[in-house]
Amino acid sequence: MENPMTVLKPLTGLVVIDEAQRMPGLFPVLRVLADREDNPATFLILGSASPELSRQASESLAGRVELIEMRGFDQSEVGEDSLDPLWMRGGFPRSFLSKQEEDSMVWRKNFIATFLERDLSNLGFGMSPVAMGRFWTMLSHYHGQIWNGNEIASSLGVAPNTAKSYLDALEQTYMVRRLQPWHVNLGKRLVKSPKIYIRDSGIFHTLQGLRSRADVQTSPKLGASWEGFALEEVIRAIQADELYFYSIHSGSELDLLAFRNGRRIGFELKFEDAPSDVEVFRNCKRRP
């Protein structure tokens, strides 16, 4: 769109604009159009998770825009009977809806390759696809664990700041969730580094080379896989105001501590047949 003002000004009703990250001059124009008194048009802007897109939207359209994250399928959309394939394949539609497990795995492998070789560059991230691929695979081994940038950087042979920039890129493109610890003065030494999760369970399984339900079931990453999958499902279901994890060096931990409408809600996410009483709930409950 070479002349967005000329094209968009006459339009009324709902106007859909796709690939907005490729139109650097769009957002100042939308600001002018959004401020018209009669407000004849509403704009639905679609685009990939580009840092530049987010920056322009927040700067040019502050107070005029609502950001909506388009996620994959969740349990409420596919039904309880499809929970297991959702866990195995993840929520990307083409992966989940594939007729065969092998087709799903092939799609995820192709997605990862395309993301590394084309999408990151198109979104403004200037990093080596090979280096990022190695980092992403290594990060999957830390799925559900406390971030240790120095250790990961040392294993990859890069500087800690470089490892952090890789993590930032994956978080900004919604591939990774960085869950911060709950920081209050509890009189005990709290863990202060974030936990890291690969957000889509199917992508996590692909990075780990887990091709089937049997592979996942026998993998030492079974518990971590379920924890990450359940975490994303809970987060989408509860619509919390703030999200943390709670952990102290004595070993007490909540996988998810959500704040919603002034209430604290704690979750312990385990792959077990029957839940058991967890001491950390009592510890957390006694805190202010």
Q: Model segments located where?
A:
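Amphipathic alpha-helical segments of the small helical/lid subdomains adjacent to P-loop NTPase cores
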Residues: 41, 46, 68-98
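Catalytic cores of nucleic-acid endonucleases
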Residues: 271-288
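Conserved catalytic/switch belt of AAA+ P-loop NTPases
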Residues: 27-51, 55-59
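Active-site ExK catalytic segment of metal-dependent nucleases
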Residues: 263-273
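Short regulatory helix/loop adjacent to the ATP-binding pocket of P-loop NTPases
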Residues: 51-67, 81-82
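Accessory nucleic acid-recognition modules appended to NTPase machines
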Residues: 101, 105-264
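Short glycine-rich substrate-engagement loop in P-loop NTPases that contacts/grips substrate
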Residues: 1-14
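Walker B catalytic acidic pair
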Residues: 18-20
